[in-house]
A protein has these predicted regions:
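Surface-exposed cleft-lining segments at the edges of enzyme active sites
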Residues: 108-133, 163-168
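Metal-dependent phosphoester-hydrolase catalytic domains
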Residues: 78-83, 155-262
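Active-site-proximal beta-strand elements of phosphoester/diester hydrolases
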Residues: 2-12, 100-115, 147, 253
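N-terminal, active-site-proximal structural segment of metallo-dependent hydrolase catalytic domains
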Residues: 1-52, 58, 65-68
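Structured beta-strand-rich core segments of catalytic domains in phosphoester-bond hydrolases
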Residues: 37-40, 44-113
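Short, Asp-centered acidic motifs that coordinate Mg2+ and/or phosphate
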Residues: 30-31, 145, 224
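Acidic/histidine-rich, metal-coordinating catalytic segments
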Residues: 142-156
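Catalytic metal-binding/acid-base residues of hydrolase active sites
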Residues: 11, 38, 107-109, 151-153, ...
Length: 262
């Protein structure tokens, strides 16, 4: 069975429910994983998405912050969640797909503005989260897909300027090394880069601060799709849908998707 899975940091699912609906109509992925839903579960507008055929869902919500959800046209089993760093914030949810593959949806902490764990508790939290994610991944077995906003652009080709961003949170060496440990410990493959290798530039996020985001094109690839346990994406199916950054009232992230034979 071929399944197309998309991931998108939507930056408030209630504010952008119609944007999500427009994406589902235009691209029709089988599964959409959302991050930064910024809503309690009971207030996520599931009925809007169910009306479009996405009647299966699992989610973890939080008022005004974080939040992850998986919307699907195919039946899902709730795979539970892990409370990384024991903070009670909604940053992970899992679902078991038909055939047994587990889908993990992550929203890794952004880490604040100062890349110093001594001076910045948010950055310390990010590094702790990644350490726990590394240990968690090493314990996993069986086929799995991991998607989400991992808030790190690991490669030089994943940022508009490697040199200028080396001391900017999301591309610092300590973060890149931590993410690489997570990937290695879990035996994960970066699907997007397997299909579209460096040095081709790839971005999935552009700051709201730019007057003209497209002209400036100062992007970063913060959103990822990984696989393990023999799962491979259909060659050539990986896409980053840049045009959605130009939508009315857009998220600062765009959808990333790939198709799998499961």
């Amino acid at each position: 069975m071929a399944l197309t899975i998309a991931t998108w940091n939507i930056n408030s699912v209630r504010l952008r429910a119609e944007l999500v609906a427009g994406f589902l109509k235009a691209e029709a992925p089988d599964i959409l994983c959302l991050q930064e839903a910024k809503s309690p579960v009971e207030k996520i507008p599931f009925e809007v998405f169910a009306a479009l055929g996405y009647g299966h869902a699992v989610a973890r919500g939080q008022k005004g912050y974080n939040g992850v959800a998986i919307l699907s046209r195919v039946p899902l089993e709730d795979g539970g969640h892990v409370d990384f760093c024991a903070k009670g914030d909604a940053r992970h949810v899992a679902a078991r797909l038909p055939g047994g593959t587990v889908l993990h949806n992550f929203y890794v902490p952004s880490g604040g503005d100062v890349p110093d764990p001594e001076a910045n508790p948010k950055f310390a939290h990010k590094l702790e989260f990644l350490d726990e994610m590394c240990a968690w991944g090493a314990r996993q077995d069986g086929p799995a897909i991991l998607v989400g906003d991992l808030n790190i652009a690991p490669l030089e080709a994943d940022v508009w300027s490697h040199k200028q961003l080396l001391k900017v949170v999301s591309h610092t060496p300590v973060e890149v090394e931590a993410l690489d440990r997570v990937r290695t410990a879990g035996g994960w493959t970066d699907v997007i880069r397997a299909h579209i290798p460096a040095p081709e530039k790839l971005y999935s996020w552009w700051s709201y601060r730019a007057r003209d985001w497209a002209e400036a094109d100062r992007g970063r690839r913060l959103d990822h799709i990984w696989t393990r346990g023999g799962i491979a994406a259909v060659p050539g199916s990986s896409r980053i849908l840049r045009d959605w950054r130009g939508a009315e009232r857009p998220s600062d992230h765009v959808p990333v998707l790939a198709t799998f034979e499961l």
